[in-house]
Amino acid sequence: MDANDKEIENLQTRIFLFLFVCITIRAYIAYYAKSVSIDKLPYLGYGALVIMIGFIYIYISGSRKTGAEVFGGKIWWDGLRPLHALLYGLFAYHAINKIDYSWKFLAADVYIGLINFFIYHTIEGNFTKIYNPSHRVSSNILISLSLSFFIYLGIIIFIS
C-alpha cells in the first residue's frame, strides 16, 4: 500500500467514524433529551454544562488542533467549537429549567455538524478522492455515505 492509498484509507475511516459514531451518538443524545421525562431533563442539562465547558476550554486553550481521530491531522471542526458550546449551553439552560423543547438545540447541533461535514469535505475534494474506481473500497464508502444521508435525514425529520 503506497502513501496515497494510506491517505485514502485514513480519510475513509475518518468519514465512517464521523458519520456512524460521532453523529449517531449525538443524534441519540438529542433523541433521548426529547424522550426523557421532564423531571430528569435537568440532569441532562448539567451534563451538557460539562460538555459546554469542555468545548470552551479546548477552543480557548488551543489544546486540540490535531488529534488521533484525524490520524494526527488538523481538526477541521475546531472553529465550530464556540457554536457547539453555545448550542450545548442553550440546551443546558433550557433543560435545567425543564423546558420541553430544549432537545431542539441538540438536534440543531447534529444538523449543523452534518452540514458542515459535507461542506468541508466537498470543498476539500475529499469525496472525489475517496470515490476513485481504482481504489478497492470506494464503492463501500459511497454506499456508507448514501445510507448515512438517508438515515440522518430520517432522524432529523423524526426528532423535529
Language-model regions: role of each:
Residues K6-I15, H135-I141:
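N-terminal membrane topogenic signal
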Residues E9-F16, G72-L80:
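Short, amphipathic, aromatic/basic-enriched membrane-interface segments that mark the entry/exit
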Residues V21-G45:
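Membrane-helix boundary elements
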Residues G45-I56:
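Generic alpha-helical transmembrane segments
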Residues I60-W76:
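Membrane-helix interface/capping segments
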Residues W77-H94:
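Hydrophobic alpha-helical membrane segments
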Residues H84-Y88, D100-N126, Y131-S148:
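Alpha-helical membrane-associated segments of multi-pass integral membrane proteins
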Residues L153-S160:
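Juxtamembrane boundary at the C-terminal end of a transmembrane helix
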